[in-house]
């Protein structure tokens, strides 16, 4: 067993509606059961977690992201840009914790800490667009619009099913997004209802890819072509209830595993990258052998 002696927790002070600050002393105390040095630092502003990870990654054996997928995105970017190679840990304390779910890390804090104490690790691939590292997903389309249209109030009240409610509201506003996608040399020029590149099992809190291999050098590519609005909606419901395998035979659906891809966004549509809304016209992405990460 490798001797890990130092661990840094980088946490979002807004996590758990601000209550994470009360739990940090308890987290540190439990981690002292295994690590001789346990430190915690909070991200004070946008990109704060990335800056902390970049500055301190080389000084710790383990760097832990404590927050949601957005905090993890920053921590991974800071670590990758630093050139250091600490093990990455995750304490899922945010609104969206897709990566932690894919790794089997429990939402309950005590059990998530148990994972850090066990130090059971796996290789985890990272996508890279030449400037920024993408931890687990990039997506666009109708389903994405319904994701960021879901209000915080509805998410608190209905949980992940808030996205279904939002999707119903967006049903008759379905956009037809013209894109050109090149995947490992194969070119697709289509008007789409949905597009996703995913490393892992979960997106939006739903298990879409069962038993996904997060370290095989490839990511899952899913494209749903724009057809009839109602048919597209039924395809969406089926995918989010039963996973992408359930729609693989649909004529409007393309599913592949890819190593490199390029997206040409002809309509300047909004994308969701690791849970954050962005816009771009063109993006070339490669899948890299990324980090060592703690799993269940």
Residues of each region from the PLM?
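ATP/NTP phosphate-donor binding region
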Residues: 1-66, 78, 186-187
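Short, well-ordered alpha-helix to beta-strand connector turns
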Residues: 4, 35, 60, 191-192, ...
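Catalytic core of DAGKc-family lipid kinases
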Residues: 10, 34, 43, 81-196
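Short Gly/Thr/Asp-enriched flexible loops that form oxyanion-binding sites at enzyme active sites
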Residues: 71-83
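Glycine-rich phosphate/pyrophosphate-binding beta-alpha loops
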Residues: 139, 196-209, 277
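Gly/Ser/Thr-rich active-site loops/lids in small-molecule metabolic enzymes
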Residues: 154-162, 207, 211-231
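A generic structural signal for short beta-strands and their flanking turns/coil linkers
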Residues: 175-177, 191-193, 215-220, 257-259
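ATP/nucleoside-binding phosphotransfer catalytic cores, i.e., glycine-rich phosphate-binding loops
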Residues: 183, 189, 213, 223-296
């Amino acid at each position: 067993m490798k001797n890990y002696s130092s661990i840094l927790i980088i946490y979002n002070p807004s996590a758990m509606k601000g209550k994470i600050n009360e739990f940090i002393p308890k987290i540190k105390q439990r981690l002292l059961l295994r690590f001789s040095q346990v430190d915690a630092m909070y991200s004070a502003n946008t990109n704060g977690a990335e800056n902390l990870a970049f500055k301190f990654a080389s000084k710790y054996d383990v760097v832990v992201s404590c927050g949601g997928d957005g905090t993890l995105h920053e921590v991974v970017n800071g670590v990758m840009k630093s050139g250091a190679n600490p093990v990455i840990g995750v304490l899922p304390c945010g609104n969206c914790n897709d990566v932690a779910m894919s790794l089997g890390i429990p939402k309950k804090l005590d059990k998530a800490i148990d994972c850090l104490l066990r130090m059971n690790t796996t290789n985890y691939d990272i996508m890279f667009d030449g400037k920024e590292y993408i931890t687990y997903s990039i997506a666009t389309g109708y389903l994405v619009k319904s994701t960021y249209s879901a209000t915080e109030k509805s998410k608190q009240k209905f949980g992940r099913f808030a996205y279904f409610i939002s999707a119903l509201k967006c049903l008759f506003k379905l956009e037809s997004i013209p894109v050109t996608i090149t995947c490992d040399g194969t070119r697709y020029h289509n008007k789409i209802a949905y597009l996703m590149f995913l490393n892992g099992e979960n997106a939006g809190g739903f298990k879409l890819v069962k038993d996904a291999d997060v370290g095989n050098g490839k990511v899952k590519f899913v494209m749903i072509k724009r057809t009839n609005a109602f048919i597209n909606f039924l395809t969406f419901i089926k995918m989010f209830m039963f996973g992408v395998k359930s729609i693989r035979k649909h004529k409007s659906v393309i599913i592949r595993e890819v190593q490199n891809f390029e997206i040409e966004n002809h309509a300047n549509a909004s994308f969701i990258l690791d849970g954050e809304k962005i816009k771009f016209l063109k993006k070339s992405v490669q899948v890299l052998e990324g980090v060592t990460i703690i799993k269940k």
